[in-house]
Regions:
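Conserved beta-strand positions in repeat-built beta-propeller and related beta-rich domains
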Residues: 20-23, 63, 71-75, 123-127, ...
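Beta-rich, blade/repeat-based domains predominating
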Residues: 1-15, 50-68, 100-118, 149-166, ...
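C-terminal hydrophobic structural anchor segments
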Residues: 133-181
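Short loop/turn segments immediately following beta-strands, especially the blade-tip
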Residues: 31-41, 82-92, 134-142, 180-188
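Beta-propeller fold detector
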Residues: 40-49, 91-100, 144-150, 189-197
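Oxyanion-binding "anion nests"
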Residues: 72-84, 88-122
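Intrinsically disordered, low-complexity linker/loop segments enriched in Gly/Pro
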Residues: 1-36
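Structural signal for beta-propeller blades
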Residues: 26-28, 77-79, 129-132, 175-177
Length: 209
């Protein structure tokens, strides 16, 4: 299991649900969660979202406004786009699009985040031609690739600042965090600001409110 995410609250979905990408089994686990206030905590495995053999689903992101889920596969470098639907209050996931997240078949796709505006989707890629892939989110929730920006070595994790103006990239092998400005077209532009963390190697980055 590489990540655990709560499904955002949606009008047609009843209760609380957890999704967990299981890279080794090529599935995303769907788990029903009952909170302590409701008689829990109880976790019940409800089902799985299957992926192609060897794809390796790693991280997911949600667009609650459009009712979409995006899943980045580490091994195949593909981005799977799902529509989230309801079957009697239970979430169902309908595959809408599959695209190659980068152009390099590097086998090291890592992190994924949606811009606060909902207009752009970003993914990071390692092992060859390391960088960030940028996609435009269409009105129907599908994506259209916009470009690719190189980063320092091994961008394992990144975040978008809450104001949507900057991207901070944690480059594990470079032992640094690199700062990018996001221009009007959603493209990351290097600022030249790099925070060295040597001898530590950053593997995750987050802002705590």
């Amino acid at each position: 299991i590489h990540q655990v995410r709560f499904l955002p609250q949606m009008a047609d979905i009843q209760g609380s649900w957890i999704l967990a990408p299981d890279l080794g089994s090529d599935k995303v686990r769907v788990i029903k969660y009952i909170a302590p206030s409701e008689g829990g905590p109880v976790l019940t495995h409800s089902g799985d979202i299957p992926f192609p053999a060897g794809s390796g689903p790693r991280h997911i992101e949600f667009d609650s406004e459009r009712g979409m889920m995006y899943c980045l596969s580490e091994l195949s470098g593909e981005l799977f786009v799902f529509r989230i639907k309801s079957a009697d209050g239970v979430p169902m996931f309908e595959l809408a699009q599959t695209v190659l997240a980068d152009e390099f078949h590097s086998g090291g796709s890592a992190d994924i985040h949606l811009h606060p505006s909902g207009r752009y989707l970003y993914t990071s890629h390692r092992l060859k031609n390391d960088g960030l892939a940028v996609s435009r989110v269409c009105d129907d929730g599908t994506i259209r690739k916009c470009g690719y920006v190189h980063t320092k070595d091994h961008p394992r994790s990144f975040l978008i600042t809450p104001d949507g103006r900057h991207i901070l990239v944690a480059s594990k092998n470079d032992l640094s965090i690199e700062v990018f400005f996001i221009d009007g077209d959603g493209m990351p532009v290097p600022t030249g600001r790099i925070a060295s963390l040597s001898p530590d190697a950053p593997t995750a980055i987050a802002i705590c409110k």
